[in-house]
Design a protein with these regions (language model features):
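N-terminal first-folded block
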Residues: 1-48
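Internal alpha/beta domain cores that form substrate/cofactor-binding pockets in large enzymes
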Residues: 1-2, 21, 25-29, 61-72, ...
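Short glycine-/acidic-enriched loop or helix-start segments at secondary-structure transitions
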Residues: 14-15, 60-62, 82
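Amphipathic, hydrophobic secondary-structure cores in small proteins
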Residues: 29-30, 39-45, 49-76
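C-terminal structural segments of small proteins and small subunits
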Residues: 68-108
């Protein structure tokens, strides 16, 4: 699948998304777009999954009719997220068009 990372998504996650094509919003030169415009641009560019740390995206955006799957992780700090990266990988692998998944990362 084609996966787009939002601004604060820890980039090292990409190394664990084997078999997926991963790009960042900055790489696509979309780092100035607001979430609604970013999701639309991602859909038009053929991205299938949007990985973000923005827990409020579901309440800020109308997700109805979206074809891109959204996966939300609650942590931006890679050292804290690293032991739980398998949860993120599983969520991305299970994503289906238009789905919304919040990954529950245990905070120690």
């Amino acid at each position: 699948m084609r996966v787009l990372f939002d601004q604060a998504t820890p980039v090292p996650i990409r190394e664990f998304l084997i078999g997926h094509t991963v790009r960042t919003a900055a790489q696509e030169q979309w780092d100035t777009l607001a979430n609604g415009d970013l999701l639309t641009a991602a859909e038009h560019a053929g991205f299938e999954v949007f990985l973000t740390t923005d827990k409020n995206i579901r309440h800020q955006q109308n997700m109805a009719g979206r074809t891109i799957a959204v996966v939300v992780i609650g942590l931006q700090q890679w050292p804290a997220l690293r032991p739980h990266v398998a949860l993120v990988v599983d969520a991305v692998n299970a994503a289906t068009p238009g789905s919304f998944t919040e990954v529950d990362i245990p905070v120690v």
